[in-house]
A protein has these predicted regions:
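Conserved SAM/AdoMet-binding glycine-rich loop
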Residues: 76-81, 88, 194-318, 328
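Conserved, mostly hydrophobic/aromatic
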Residues: 165, 185, 202, 238, ...
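Terminal RNA-binding accessory module
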Residues: 350-454
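Radical SAM enzyme [4Fe-4S]-AdoMet core and its adjacent flexible, acidic
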Residues: 12, 211-232, 278-279, 342-373
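Generic beta-strand/beta-sheet core signal
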Residues: 8, 82, 203-205, 239-241, ...
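Conserved beta-strand core positions
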Residues: 5, 42-43, 153, 200, ...
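Short acidic/polar active-site loop segments enriched in Thr and Asp
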Residues: 101, 198, 234, 333, ...
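Proteins enriched for Cys/Gly/acidic motifs involved in redox and nucleic-acid/cofactor modification
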Residues: 1-210, 249, 264, 285-297, ...
């Protein structure tokens, strides 16, 4: 029997890691991955429904993939939906989407091959759902089949979240925070380095409390030091660390470990204390200001990325003005803005004074305009500097390549456009002198024979 499988992964980088693990399990059990869904016997869609837009994309993708069940279009004998969508809506799922043959929940990924076998055996409407607080399955990470470029990979260090933000459905779908064992993470990172991974990007719903559940205290600093010692890794990058739980020990490890990029993604969500309180956040403007100051004191060259939500229920003109002032004051190096999404089943969805969509979008545009000016000024300061750049590809134009510095995360931050008379290859580290700056990107030329001082 043919056992070809096609995979579509939606949503965040954490979802991508889950997809890579599932694909590895399927291959271990005799399935062959194909890029063309029309050739697949089984199609898996790993879904996201964190916000309304993600939910709509997931449903559209499922319906798009279902067309391959038509013999005139494809060979699909089973459509499996994995991840958040099935976990969140499992009771009504098959009534709403009868095209789907099985759902696999957020803690049941290790059963993906078993489910695929059942579908090929003729079973219908299979549900594989476990408790959302199920302990992490540590052994499957070594089976991952990377879907990223071969020189970088994400390392998912925990699952779930202990925060109870009033706007967020993640704890309902992913459960409480559960850390992976330290030694398992080091083993997986070592295997990734042996496969050629040079940049390791650490992710979780909340990375800053890693280890607290297993070891009685946050152990992110210990993990960073252990990863720093792995031969072959060049850059280690930290995402999704929250200011209220980011420890002095972690900051010290970031500053002292030479492979750890002076970069942090630290979502603050808002800059007004009253809004933060309504959001259920445990931070404050003062705490955020102090934590940013500590990071910049320890690492003057650090790039701090953050994320904001505008248009939260009850956000007044005064509160929004306070947010604008805070963004102008803090001058975050990288910043993204979401318009608040009213999510069914959350506390915030039932709050009074919901903000009109038009107002949300206006406020989002205002913050992004402020950040654009900040980013352009920061980019201008890079002109004349000599930076290490990781090459990611080549433009159609002759001798123009693109890459990233230590201050830029893959897929979300700016690029450096590099001129070189010699051919450069994805995964190369090159030295570049910056000659021009855009609003978010840099332009420069390769410099040969330059050595960075320790």
């Amino acid at each position: 029997m043919s056992r070809k499988i096609a995979f579509t992964s939606l949503g965040c980088d954490k979802n991508r890691v889950d997809s890579e693990v599932m694909l590895g399990i399927l291959q271990q059990n005799g399935y062959t991955a194909v890029a063309d869904a029309a050739e697949a016997d089984i199609i898996v869609v790993n879904t996201c429904c964190f916000i309304k837009d993600a939910l709509e994309e997931s449903i559209e993708t499922i319906l798009e993939m279902s067309k391959y069940k038509n013999p005139e279009v494809g060979h699909c004998k089973g459509l499996i939906v994995a991840g958040c969508l099935g976990q969140r809506y499992e009771k009504e799922f098959f009534d709403e989407l009868p095209e789907v043959d099985a759902i696999v929940g957020t803690t049941a990924y290790e059963s993906i091959a078993e489910v695929a076998d059942e579908i090929l055996g003729g079973k219908e409407q299979v549900k594989q759902l476990e408790s959302i607080d199920l302990a992490m399955q540590d052994g499957n990470g070594k089976l991952r089949v990377l879907s990223t470029a071969p020189y970088f990979a994400y390392l998912k260090i925990s699952e779930g979240c202990d925060n109870r933000c009033t706007y967020c459905v993640i704890p309902q779908m992913r459960g409480r925070h559960r850390s992976r064992e330290l030694e398992s993470l080091v083993e997986e990172a070592t295997l990734l380095a042996q496969q050629g991974v040079k940049e390791l990007v650490i992710v979780a719903q909340d990375t800053s409390i890693y280890g607290r559940d297993l070891y009685g205290k946050p152990m992110l600093d210990v993990l960073l030091r252990r990863l720093n010692a792995i031969e072959g890794l060049e850059w280690i990058r930290l995402l999704y660390a929250y200011p209220e739980t980011l420890t002095e020990e972690t900051i010290a490890a970031m500053a002292s470990c030479e492979k750890v990029c002076h970069y942090i993604d630290m979502p603050i969500q808002h800059g007004n204390d009253a809004v933060l309180k309504r959001m259920g956040r445990k931070s404050s403007q003062t705490l955020i200001r102090e934590k940013v100051a500590r990071l910049r004191a320890a690492m003057p060259d650090i790039a701090i990325r953050t994320t904001l939500i505008v248009g939260f229920p009850g956000e007044t003109e005064e509160e929004f003005a306070n947010l604008q002032s805070f963004v102008q004051e803090m001058k975050f190096d990288r910043l993204g803005v979401f318009s608040y999404s009213q999510e069914e089943g959350t506390v915030a969805a039932e709050m009074e004074n919901q903000i009109p969509e038009e107002t949300k979008e206006e406020r989002r545009d205002i913050i992004m305009d402020i950040q654009k000016s900040i980013a352009a000024a920061l980019c201008e300061k890079e002109v004349g500097k000599v930076l290490e750049v990781l090459i990611e590809g080549k433009l159609p134009e002759e001798n123009i390549f693109c890459g990233r510095t230590r201050r830029d995360a893959p897929e979300i931050d700016g690029l450096v456009f590099v001129s070189s008379e010699e051919e450069l290859y994805s995964g190369d580290f090159v030295t570049v002198k910056i000659r021009e700056a855009g609003d978010y990107d840099l332009m420069g030329d390769v410099v040969y024979g330059y050595e960075f001082s320790e």
